[in-house]
A protein has these predicted regions:
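Conserved hydrophobic segment flanking the Walker A/P-loop of ABC-type ATPase nucleotide-binding domains
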Residues: 26-28
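Conserved ABC transporter NBD signature motif
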Residues: 58-68
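Helix-to-loop junction immediately C-terminal to a conserved catalytic motif
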Residues: 50
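ABC ATPase NBD coupling module
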Residues: 54, 68-84, 110
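Conserved ABC ATPase "signature" region
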Residues: 69, 111-130
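Short coil-to-helix segment of the ABC ATPase nucleotide-binding domain corresponding to the Q-loop/switch region
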Residues: 93-102
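A short, flexible loop at the N-terminus of ABC-type nucleotide-binding domains that lies
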Residues: 1-21, 53-56, 72-74, 107
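The feature captures the beta-strand-to-loop junction immediately N-terminal to the Walker
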Residues: 35-37
Length: 132
């Protein structure tokens, strides 16, 4: 899976640019790290890539995943997530139970909820992790 950023930049609603445009290609199998002091825009950049910015911000440039432009796709269709530095899980719950918190409230019924969780685990190649 490759990720490419082409002149990606973020501005505020008052037209203040938060960082210089970013151009980078991260090829399949490569790992990249965003580093810098507090307040320089690391989280904002990652949120722009994932499509999680509020309407108070404007994004210009392009985000490509596997060569496909995803810049204007809804968050769910981008298939891009953020791994936070600190765990955001409930340590007393299983992997499956933690994932249940992320399900839409429209998924009603234990069997349907379990099926969606198992499908997500399978997509992540973690199908044996439900009860861990």
């Amino acid at each position: 899976m490759s990720l490419e950023l082409r002149s990606l930049s973020v501005t505020t609603s008052t037209h203040v640019s938060l960082f210089t445009p970013v151009d980078i290609v991260i090829a399949s199998g490569e790992v990249a790290c965003v580093m810098g002091p507090s307040g320089v825009g690391k989280s904002t950049l990652l949120n722009a890539i994932g499509g999680h910015l509020s309407t108070h911000f404007s994004v210009t440039g392009e985000v490509l995943l596997n060569g496909q432009k995803v810049t204007h796709k809804p968050v769910a269709e981008r298939q891009i997530g953020i791994l936070f530095q600190d765990p955001l899980l409930f340590p007393h719950l299983t992997v499956g139970d933690n994932l249940a918190f992320g399900l839409s409230s429209n998924v009603i019924g234990a069997k349907k909820r379990r099926a969606q969780i198992e499908q997500a685990l399978e997509q992540a190649q973690l199908q044996d992790f439900y009860h861990r």
